[in-house]
Amino acid sequence: MAQQSLIYSFVARGTVILVEFTDFKGNFTSIAAQCLQKLPSSNNKFTYNCDGHTFNYLVEDGFTYCVVAVDSAGRQIPMSFLERVKEDFNKRYGGGKAATAQANSLNKEFGSKLKEHMQYCMDHPDEISKLAKVKAQVSEVKGVMMENIEKVLDRGEKIELLVDKTENLRSQAQDFRTTGTQMRRKMWLQNMKIKLIVLAIIIALILIIVLSVCHGFKC
């Protein structure tokens, strides 16, 4: 990945940009701000393409986290960067200063943090990609679990059915254990019978050999 794949970032409350950082000059800042004005307010992730660059947004709880990246950076690295920024920002300002801060008033405090996160993500692309894949898998599992729970809670009979099913499974498991014990006992008895029969045959063969060699009992 190119060393300068992430070129601009900001954090906004609504449409008010509280902190931003870039080492470059260009109209990407105004384009990013224009996109911010048109973003849906619902929690989500958005990516827009423009002239070889991507404008990536993470919207959560009234705050928007943005990063402009070169197209070759893909989507995973920019989105992982936004997640890191969101976590750091919430730790520092969650439920406090960020709720009333003025435009660009957090530049001195948090601008350097944006730069640090940018540099880290650009310097450790492999690590970021691995973490992103793990988080994606976890999110997918959480999504499936939540969906299933919501489906169950929609109808009371489904919950009852699950309880009934569980009871049936318990009873089936008990029956299986009982049957298994009986089967093991039966197999043990069969094995013992076979062993006794084989032993009797061996003894009989030995007796026959002894009798034939000794001409009866005249040894």
From Swiss-Prot:
Designated name of the protein: Vesicle-associated membrane protein 721
Record bears the keyword Nucleotide-binding: no
**Cytoplasmic compartment: which residues?**
1-196
Matching InterPro entries = Longin-like_dom_sf, Longin_dom, Synaptobrevin-like, Synaptobrevin-like_transport, V_SNARE_CC
Regions of this protein lying in the Vesicular compartment? 218-219
Q: Could you mention a single GO BP entry for this protein? A: vesicle-mediated transport
Its taxonomic path starts at:
Eukaryota, Viridiplantae, Streptophyta, Embryophyta, Tracheophyta
Cite the entry's keywords alphabetically.
Cell membrane, Coiled coil, Endosome, Membrane, Protein transport, Transmembrane, Transmembrane helix, Transport
Sequence ranges assigned to domain v-SNARE coiled-coil homology in this UniProt record? 130-190
